[in-house]
A protein has these predicted regions:
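Active-site bordering "gate/hinge" segments
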Residues: 1-154, 162, 171, 175, ...
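B-type heme-binding environments
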Residues: 157
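Solvent-exposed, well-ordered loop and adjacent helix/strand elements within mature globular domains
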Residues: 174-196
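Cysteine/selenocysteine-centered motifs that mediate thiol-based redox chemistry or coordinate metal-sulfur cofactors
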Residues: 189-219
Length: 219
């Protein structure tokens, strides 16, 4: 038996779905959630897992994602992800550098890291699809982040980070403000660096959608 449930799009990712969605999620063995706003960090998803439901969340998924990263060999994705996680678990500190000037470092607390392998096979498990990254909280990250190409705010150039929070932003020459600065002013909490991860899905390509881009092998 299967059932299709539609509901009005909420305002933000992580917003709770309206009734009867949470109760419906607990009634089935598997929930596949191709939504515009993510259900991953919701009580509805957590309660469904407690009831034994396997949940796959696919926020903002589109045809291009269906035809690329979702068709990956997920046993291979799992192998790469587990190896990457193993390297992280053996490390005390991570340092990220790029030719354009990025230089960031932070301590590794492996207990905060999650292996997003795409394997959602046991009762009560959940995952974000397409999958392919070990990710976690970069404790007290410090340094400089250079934005080579950032479509959301093309005028932004360099971000200074101290103790896990953005403290300064430099724009391209001749430009006084950026969309990123406006976002920081509107949502002060968005200055906090909440996640570090790197992609482990060989079939994921950069398309301008975070759901897939963060899973691309090499990012």
């Amino acid at each position: 038996e299967h059932q299709l449930v539609n509901y009005e799009e909420p305002e933000s990712h992580g917003a709770e779905p309206p009734e009867p969605v949470p109760e419906k999620m607990k009634e089935f063995d598997v929930v596949v959630a191709p939504t515009m706003k993510s259900l991953t960090h919701t009580d509805a998803r957590k309660e469904a897992n407690k009831a034994g439901t396997r949940v796959a969340t696919l926020p903002t998924v589109g045809r291009e994602i269906w035809n690329t990263s979702l068709k990956a060999d997920y046993q291979r994705v799992e192998e790469i992800t587990e190896k990457a996680y193993e390297l992280l678990s053996e490390s005390e500190e991570v340092r990220i550098t790029t030719p354009s000037g990025t230089d960031l470092s932070f301590k590794v607390d492996i207990d905060t890291y999650h292996r997003d392998t795409g394997m959602i096979q046991e009762k009560g498990e959940y995952g974000n699809l397409p999958a392919g990254e070990p990710n976690g909280y970069p404790e007290k990250i410090n340094g400089t982040l250079v934005l080579d190409h950032f479509p959301f705010s093309p005028s932004a150039k360099k971000v200074e980070i101290k103790d896990g929070k953005v403290v300064a932003l430099e724009n391209k020459q001749g430009e006084n403000s950026s969309e990123l600065e406006k976002s920081f002013e509107k949502y002060p909490c968005s200055k906090k660096i909440a996640e570090f991860g790197f992609g482990t899905n060989p079939e994921a390509k950069l398309i301008g959608n975070t759901l897939q881009d963060e899973k691309a092998l090499g990012t």
